[in-house]
Regions:
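Thiamine diphosphate
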Residues: 1-61, 68, 78-271, ...
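Terminal amphipathic helices with adjacent charged low-complexity linkers/tails
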Residues: 57-91
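Glycine-/small-residue-rich active-site loops that bind phosphorylated ligands and cofactors
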Residues: 127-128, 153, 179-180, 309-310, ...
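A structural preference for short, hydrophobic beta-strand core positions in alpha/beta folds
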Residues: 149, 242, 330-332, 386, ...
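Short acidic loop-to-helix transition motifs that present clustered carboxylates
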Residues: 153-158, 245-249, 334-340, 445, ...
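Acidic, low-complexity mobile loops and tails
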Residues: 426-471, 480, 486
Length: 491
């Protein structure tokens, strides 16, 4: 750290420093201190003088080249060109035994095993915790020097990772939640993302940043439920991803590892343990090309584009419309930036109708960007619609959270209107059978199991509304469950 000894601007005043004698800080010059440390550790003054002369000559030569050279030409992309990518490959078999969380863990394990340059850095990622959601569990035990806990400082995590990348390592930096990315946004925008462009391709900072994102889980609220992919995609030099299946998560992580490009990998907390979206254990051979979308359902009547948590809702809508004789094409974008314009454009040229669904808030979201570019590129008139989170924050109350986020109902109603189709809803009568199921949910977004520690009622008991039924213990907390209505306990 270099302490401030003068004002930032050209004014000759000491107003920029609170020290009475700024000259007293000159002995804190890190270059001078490093020179002294090297001398104390046996490096001769002659060697240091020779090194300084060599560096000075390099600076002088660079200055001459810059002064005498032609004016620089503008460049219109900040990204490092992608190397030739392999075709998409997911070995198909009927043995789907890994969730998204498990598949990502095995991809990280594979990367650690094949490259000693791979280093994982983040808050609480070492065992026994192995990340808030257990993503890195067992990895620090298997690779103790290369899976390391960090300080509780996102900017420090990315700063250290940038240095490691510039030194030839392959750092993977973990943000506990995507909501904390803004703390380190300047480092993403001005350092990691800009490094290749600033150095005219001489330097590159291939840092992979991983962050769990999104809502659709209890115990969240405004600090742990955002996705923020639009502000991340606004960074010119970073690739941004958000998968919705275990196979795509592993395939993209493997592709990112081979790309040698700065990458931000967002993964949806609502799907990390979804057993309907699992993959097989051949993780090392999973590969999903960067920038390639996936058509998860083929159709010709309307196009739905989405990514992350809303994807299962979009696919369910496609199934329901199919039963009514309407064929919806559903596209999983997978890569947010650079996104697959050709795939979406080809679909919209066929269907003439485009719906984009995302849980990020609406204004300046990716939905607006996708619709704008497709509208500019298509030769025909199209109808478009966005289904997003309104420009508001995500509430703590779970039912209110679900109302704010894109839902199956919102998707069905928007598509029906575009297709001039009628839709009606039947409200389930929970009192029709006389039974009311009491559901237990965790109080934390990382809770996956809820165990009953003490049951206060028995079968046949008569209970009142609000009466205590049980004490339960989730992964991160203990709580009590009360009866939502008066009645008789049945098993």
């Amino acid at each position: 750290m270099v302490r401030k000894t003068a004002p930032n601007g050209p004014l000759k005043t000491n107003l920029g420093s609170s020290f009475e004698n700024p000259n007293s800080l000159k002995n804190l010059d890190p270059c001078a201190n490093l020179r002294n440390v090297l001398i104390d550790n046996g490096v001769t003054i002659e060697v240091l003088n020779g090194l300084e002369e060599k560096v000075q000559k390099q600076i002088d030569e660079a200055f001459k080249i810059a002064r005498n050279g032609l004016p620089p030409k503008p460049t219109f992309t900040a990204k490092r060109p992608l190397d030739i990518q392999k075709p998409e490959h997911i070995f198909e078999n009927n043995q789907k035994d890994l969730t998204m969380l498990e598949a990502m863990r095995e991809s990280l394990r594979h990367q650690l095993s094949i490259s000693h340059d791979t280093i994982l850095l983040g808050q609480d990622i070492e065992d026994p915790k192995g990340d808030v959601f257990g993503l890195t569990r067992t990895l620090s035990s298997n690779f103790p020097k290369r899976v390391r806990n960090s300080a509780l400082a996102e900017n420090t995590i990315l700063g250290v990772s940038t240095g490691l990348a510039l030194a030839g390592k392959k750092p993977i930096a973990f943000m506990q939640f995507s909501d904390f990315l803004p703390v380190a946004y300047n480092h993403l925008l001005s350092e990691i993302g800009a490094m290749y462009w600033r150095s005219n391709g001489q330097w590159n900072a291939p840092v992979t940043v991983m962050a769990i994102a999104g809502g659709y889980r209890p115990g969240l609220g405004p600090y742990h439920a955002q996705t923020l992919e639009s502000i991340c995609a606004h960074i010119p030099g970073i690739d941004v991803f958000m998968p919705s299946t275990a196979e795509d998560a592993a395939g993209l992580l493997n592709a990112i590892s081979e790309s040698n490009s700065p990458s931000l990998f967002l993964f949806p907390k609502s799907l990390i343990n979804d057993r309907s979206r699992m993959t097989n254990s051949d993780i090392s051979n999973h590969y999903v090309p960067i920038g390639k979308a996936k058509v998860s359902r083929v159709g010709q009547d309307l196009t739905i584009v989405s990514w992350g948590s809303p994807m299962p809702l979009c696919e369910k809508a496609g199934e329901v419309f199919y039963e009514a004789g309407i064929n919806i094409e559903v596209i999983d974008l997978r890569t947010i930036f650079p996104w697959d314009i050709d795939c979406v454009l080809n679909s919209v040229n066929k269907t003439k109708k485009l719906v984009v669904v995302h849980e990020d808030n609406q204004t300046c979201g990716m939905g607006a960007e996708i619709i704008a570019q497709i509208t500019e590129l298509t030769d025909s008139s199209i109808i478009t619609k966005r289904i997003t989170r309104p420009d508001t924050y995500i509430p703590y109350d779970y039912s209110a959270q679900i109302e704010v986020l894109p839902s199956f109902k919102k998707i069905m109603e928007a598509c029906s209107k575009m297709l001039n189709a009628e839709i009606s809803w039947e409200k389930e009568d929970i009192n029709q059978s006389g039974l009311l199921n009491v559901k237990a949910i965790g109080s934390s977004p990382s809770d996956e199991t809820v165990n009953i520690t003490e049951l206060f009622v028995s079968e046949g008991d008569i209970v009142k509304d609000g009466q205590l039924l049980a004490s339960v213990e989730a992964d991160k907390s203990s709580m009590e469950i009360s009866s939502p209505a008066s009645g008789k306990i049945e098993e």
